[in-house]
Amino acid sequence: MAFLALGINHKTASVDVRERVAFTPEQLVEALQQLCRLTDSREAAILSTCNRSELYIEQEHLSADVVLRWLADYHHLDLDDLRASAYVHEDDAAVRHMMRVASGLDSLVLGEPQILGQMKSAYAVAREAGTVGPLLGRLFQATFNSAKQVRTDTAIGENPVSVAFAAVSLAKQIFSDLQRSQALLIGAGETITLVARHLHDLGVKRIVVANRTLERASILAEQFGAHAVLLADIPAELVRSDIVISSTASQLPILGKGAVESALKLRKHKPIFMVDIAVPRDIEPEVGELDDVYLYSVDDLHEVVAENLKSRQGAAQAAEEMVSAGADDFMVRLRELAAVDVLKAYRQQGERLRDEELLKAQRLLANGSSAEDVLVQLARGLTNKLLHAPSVQLKKLTAEGRLDALAMAQELFALGEGASDSSSDKKLQ
């Protein structure tokens, strides 16, 4: 049993690197199965968001370099380049890292709640792929419980702050009166839903949701009195949009420089504020070169986020202590589980010996032996048989110089200090 958490995030890698290491939802099942097959991993899960791509693995013998090499090969990356941005956590540290991530303690926005849902999705996909077994499954459940405790017992989640909130905060800085602004949201996932909620609460004049499928866009639009359109309608909507915020799972850019340039001409160069939260990016970086365009990537949100963190810093220490306690408790319980099979086999052996001696006793009673004699023989026979194998093994180990076995036997059988010394003294006298 050995746990491994390996990956990159917003603190170790730029958006250029992160978008090259990201997994699309369509890739995950096949990638997980390949990961287990090619790296000798017994269980695995992949968490891939705009801010991080992480692999959670259970192996008999840890081989982080093999896993890192697989990740580089899968995404056609130079191994040394990937290694420069990657981090590796093993066993206790891996457990603690997973719990910190799920609790929002390792997020770009401290305490942001979306990461827990993303972690649950990673677990669900791994179950679908058949790459989660009993050990990683227990770890995920313990991780979810730890994150829930942090949310319930600390103020880490108060004063809602998220990447979505940061994007809207930037929009407020550029457009003093959002009630006169029109917004185009590209995508219909969790982040865009949060953006739509924030914009709606601020009274934005008109919100349009563009998505690959009109059905998904319509479901989201109905919640906030918005309009739903297809991705093909984006060029027309750009002309009317003061704010554009995009977050899809597309592997290719959705908005190019030419389309935005055309929209600006029709807008008579009225400014457009754009935030690209997606990884890989939805908006070509060259769009930012245009006059009258304010383009921000997810990495540009750091300053806004820093301001919003202040209210949560006080709760962070208490949350860290809860996570550490949760990780320690999980590892203790997991190590206890390692003894279950041995204890089960030992109990079965004891019950077999008991049944053998009991059968002998019953035969003696049937043949007329006194109950007292039978009980004495039963007790003696059971004692001798139960002690035979441990006695033989203990003598063998000490004869081989394994004196640590004596201390282990004293602890295992609760014999108390000096038991072995007193018996040795008697034999020497």
Swiss-Prot record:
Residues that, per the record, bind NADP(+): G187, A188, G189, E190, T191, I192
Annotated CDD domains: NAD_bind_Glutamyl_tRNA_reduct
Active-site residues from the entry: C50
Superkingdom field: Bacteria
Pathway the protein acts in: Porphyrin-containing compound metabolism; protoporphyrin-IX biosynthesis; 5-aminolevulinate from L-glutamyl-tRNA(Glu): step 1/2
Matches recorded under InterPro entries: 4pyrrol_synth_GluRdtase, 4pyrrol_synth_GluRdtase_dimer, 4pyrrol_synth_GluRdtase_N, GluRdtase_CS, GluRdtase_dimer_dom_sf, GluRdtase_N_sf, NAD(P)-bd_dom_sf, Shikm_DH/Glu-tRNA_Rdtase
Catalysis performed (reactions): (S)-4-amino-5-oxopentanoate + tRNA(Glu) + NADP(+) = L-glutamyl-tRNA(Glu) + NADPH + H(+)
Quaternary organization: Homodimer.
Recorded domain comment: Possesses an unusual extended V-shaped dimeric structure with each monomer consisting of three distinct domains arranged along a curved 'spinal' alpha-helix. The N-terminal catalytic domain specifically recognizes the glutamate moiety of the substrate. The second domain is the NADPH-binding domain, and the third C-terminal domain is responsible for dimerization.
Protein name in UniProt: Glutamyl-tRNA reductase
Species of origin: Pseudomonas fluorescens (strain SBW25)
Lineage: Bacteria, Pseudomonadati, Pseudomonadota, Gammaproteobacteria, Pseudomonadales
